[in-house]
Structure formats: structure tokens, C-alpha cells
């Protein structure tokens, strides 16, 4: 693929995720948008690693680390969301004022 096409696709994914993260009122949707942002960044890592130096896999290895961290973040985030839902019966961000207590 052409470098510009992949970068434009990655920018679109990043902007869609950022827009969803800013406008989302649901915690699960916000976590999904955060994952979309991380996947766009991973796409950039792999693209630049492939474009600038084919012999080394630094971007690919860093991408694997980001995927592992994103999986841990998703597991912890969903555990927190399920705990909030059990206690408050809602996953809306604006109704959850946990830091005031």
C-alpha cells in the first residue's frame, strides 16, 4: 500500500475515536473509542516501521506491547464499569460522580 493511504486511514480512525471519546456519555462506548485510538496509533507504528526500515521490527514489537497494554486496560476498564453498573445501575459518565465522595 502507499504510505499516504495508510496514514490517511489511520488519521481517520484516530479522529473517529477522538470524536467518540469526547462526545460519548457511555463508559463502554468511551472504552471502545479509546481502543480505536490505540489501534490507529498501532497502524502508524507498523507503517513507519515497514516504510523506513524493513530489516528491523522495532515498530512491530512496540505494537505488540501496545496491544498487550490495551488488553489489560480494557479488562480493568470493563471490570470498573461492571462494578459501577452493579452499584449505580447506570454506565453514563455524567451521572457517575465517584471522585466527590
From Swiss-Prot:
The keyword Transmembrane helix applies. GO terms for molecular function: oxidoreductase activity, acting on NAD(P)H, quinone or similar compound as acceptor; quinone binding. It catalyses: a plastoquinone + NADH + (n+1) H(+)(in) = a plastoquinol + NAD(+) + n H(+)(out); a plastoquinone + NADPH + (n+1) H(+)(in) = a plastoquinol + NADP(+) + n H(+)(out). Its main location: plastid. It is found in: Plastid, Chloroplast thylakoid membrane. Keywords: Chloroplast, Membrane, NAD, NADP, Plastid, Plastoquinone, Quinone, Thylakoid, Translocase, Transmembrane, Transmembrane helix, Transport. It is a multi-pass membrane protein. Pfam families: Oxidored_q2 (PF00420). One of its GO terms (biological process) is ATP synthesis coupled electron transport. The keyword NADP applies. GO terms for cellular component: chloroplast thylakoid membrane; NADH dehydrogenase complex. The chain crosses the membrane at residues 2-22, 32-52, 61-81. Its EC number is 7.1.1.-. Gene3D superfamilies: 1.10.287.3510. NDH shuttles electrons from NAD(P)H:plastoquinone, via FMN and iron-sulfur (Fe-S) centers, to quinones in the photosynthetic chain and possibly in a chloroplast respiratory chain. The immediate electron acceptor for the enzyme in this species is believed to be plastoquinone. Couples the redox reaction to proton translocation, and thus conserves the redox energy in a proton gradient. Belongs to the complex I subunit 4L family. PANTHER family: NADH-UBIQUINONE OXIDOREDUCTASE CHAIN 4L, NADH-UBIQUINONE OXIDOREDUCTASE SUBUNIT ND4L. NCBIfam families: PRK05715.1-2 (NF004320). This is NAD(P)H-quinone oxidoreductase subunit 4L, chloroplastic. It comes from Arabis hirsuta.
